[in-house]
A protein has these predicted regions:
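Rossmann-fold NAD(P) dinucleotide-binding segment
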Residues: 143-195
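Active-site-proximal catalytic alpha-helix in oxidoreductases
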Residues: 219, 254-283, 287-306
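Rossmann-fold dinucleotide-binding core
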Residues: 185, 192-245, 249-251, 255-258
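Extended, charge-rich alpha-helical interface modules
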Residues: 2-105, 122, 126
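Hydrophobic/small residue at the entry helix of a nucleotide-binding pocket
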Residues: 115-116
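Adenosine-cofactor binding site in Rossmann-like domains, unifying the SAM/SAH pocket
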Residues: 131-144
Length: 381
């Protein structure tokens, strides 16, 4: 009969600690070997012009590792945390290497003293780029900045972008690049192209994130072609060197997607916040009852209403595709409101099932993503 763990005599604690220390040392050696391989990967990517971040590969690798952990009886959350930290360290090492190899351009940021413009100025400066930022009460004039830099970035409110582009566009020198970081693309791109000479290239960009973090790690940036190919390729490579995942699109597709991604989502959040305000709901008390989903939703509502009203007003009103989608939103909200008012359970079930059928191929990914978000929220309290 085999000896069970309960009947086995206890081992000496100092011996156990010695063995643990030995295993920890082995782990450190493995980590050092892994980081050396990461540097080799970075050198290869620099030579081939590849981005530092590959979302699909990273996700597939983590799934494989989690399955192997499960097969060995290891807790998935611990393994996920360990490899998430390792992947983050690996990406940072790759980005730093790629940034040292990147061509250093003179960058002028119009509107570079606050918000996203200030964030980008800081990111580029820390990697050795010469950056000139100007704001309403700081620095040289926008025209002077435009005339003396290789890359000129427009980081101004949506409502001002077209006017600023028309004002500074004629000042750019031949061979330079004018780009924006606005959340609509058709009107800004048209204004940048119309206001600049044929010798100036134009690129439309839209970082799909806010001014936080140390750079663009794992963040998406949409690129839209304006005029020319040279600077388009350079800007794409530059974003990728700082860890961004670049999505290429036409200005028309970008604006239609933003009507869904930004207008619909932000309008929904505004409506929810407005309802809570009309109810004068006790938010602190509601959190004592809250499910993780409600806590997430309330956090997003609070986040939006802690920012500038003008930004969201511009997002909702400047996109030419917004009116049609907002009308559809109103129709669907009205459909459910009528069903609730009439206690029409069948109508709710019918529409729910129609949407579920539309989303069935998307459901597996959605459950996986939302589960990860909710688990992390519960862990963090």
């Amino acid at each position: 009969m085999s000896e069970t763990s309960s009947s086995r005599p206890p081992r000496d604690l100092s011996q156990l600690r010695t063995e643990l220390a030995s295993k920890d040392t082995e782990i450190v050696k493995l980590l050092a070997d892994r980081m050396r391989l990461i540097r080799d990967v970075a050198e290869y990517k620099a030579e081939k012009g590849l981005p530092s971040f590959d979302r699909e590969r990273e996700g597939e690798l983590l799934d494989v590792l989690l399955q192997r952990a499960h097969d060995r009886g290891l807790p998935g959350d611990v393994v996920r945390d360990v490899f998430t930290a390792l992947f983050e360290a690996s990406r940072l090492d790759q980005r730093r290497f790629l940034q040292t190899r990147a061509d250093k351009y003179k960058i002028g940021i119009i509107g570079g003293t606050a918000g996203m413009g200030a964030f980008m100025a800081n990111v580029f400066r820390q990697s050795g780029f010469e950056v000139e930022a100007m704001g309403l009460d700081f620095g040289r004039s926008a025209e002077e900045v435009a005339a003396s830099n290789e890359i000129v970035i427009l980081s101004v409110p949506i409502a001002s972008t077209v006017e600023v582009a028309r004002r500074v566009g004629p000042k750019l020198r031949p061979g330079a690049c004018l780009m924006d970081i606005t959340s609509i693309k058709r009107a800004p791109l048209a204004a940048m192209i119309e206001s600049t000479s044929e010798e100036v290239e134009v690129v439309g960009t839209h970082p799909m994130f806010g001014p936080h973090g140390i750079d663009f790690d794992r963040q998406k940036v949409v690129l839209c072609r304006g005029r020319g190919d040279l600077w388009y390729a350079r800007i794409k490579k530059l974003y990728e060197a700082f860890g961004a995942e670049v999505v290429e699109a036409t200005a028309e597709e970008h604006d239609l997607q933003m009507a869904v991604i930004q207008v619909l989502v932000h309008e929904k959040t505004m409506v929810l916040g407005s309802v809570l305000e009309r109810l004068k709901a006790d938010l602190a008390r509601s959190l004592q009852f809250a499910s993780p989903i409600y806590r997430t939703e309330l956090a997003m509502i609070g986040r939006m209403f802690s920012q500038h009203a003008e930004l969201y007003a511009d997002i909702l009103t400047a996109n030419d595709d917004a009116t049609r989608l907002s009308s559809l939103f109103e129709q669907e909200a009205g459909h459910f409101a009528r069903a609730v008012a009439m206690h029409d359970r069948a109508a709710v079930v019918k529409r729910f099932q129609q949407v579920a059928e539309y989303m069935k191929e998307f459901a597996s990914w959605a459950r996986k993503q939302s589960d990860a978000i909710l688990v992390e929220l519960v862990r963090r309290g």
